[in-house]
């Protein structure tokens, strides 16, 4: 089994060919192809971690759609002063399909 650890959207993800992965927003529209930098490559019993060897490895992915994560609510409250603050946030995400590890 071939899989790679890639850096994508400020995080590290374990991916193999055919996987669907949700990342922090990546530039590009639906249908475009992106390359992700590999940090580790496992091909059966062979493990590659050397930077010189990983520079030759390309992990390609196809952008499927841009979406938004669930809404989270942030609240601040200070007792006895009447101070209240409420804020919401939805993270911008991109869903990709891993198309190749070479």
UniProtKB/Swiss-Prot annotation:
GO biological process: translation
PROSITE patterns the UniProt entry points to: RIBOSOMAL_L21 (PS01169)
Any single GO CC term annotated in Swiss-Prot or TrEMBL for this entry: ribonucleoprotein complex
Presence of the UniProt keyword RNA-binding in the record: yes
Keywords: Ribonucleoprotein, Ribosomal protein, RNA-binding, rRNA-binding
GO molecular function, a single term: rRNA binding
InterPro entries hit by this protein: bL21-like (IPR028909), bL21-like_sf (IPR036164), Ribosomal_bL21 (IPR001787), Ribosomal_bL21_CS (IPR018258)
UniProt key word Transmembrane: no
Pfam families, per database record: Ribosomal_L21p
Similarity comment: family membership: Belongs to the bacterial ribosomal protein bL21 family.
Quaternary assembly: Part of the 50S ribosomal subunit. Contacts protein L20.
Function comment: This protein binds to 23S rRNA in the presence of protein L20.
Name of protein: Large ribosomal subunit protein bL21
Source species of the chain: Pseudarthrobacter chlorophenolicus (strain ATCC 700700 / DSM 12829 / CIP 107037 / JCM 12360 / KCTC 9906 / NCIMB 13794 / A6) (Arthrobacter chlorophenolicus)
Gene: rplU
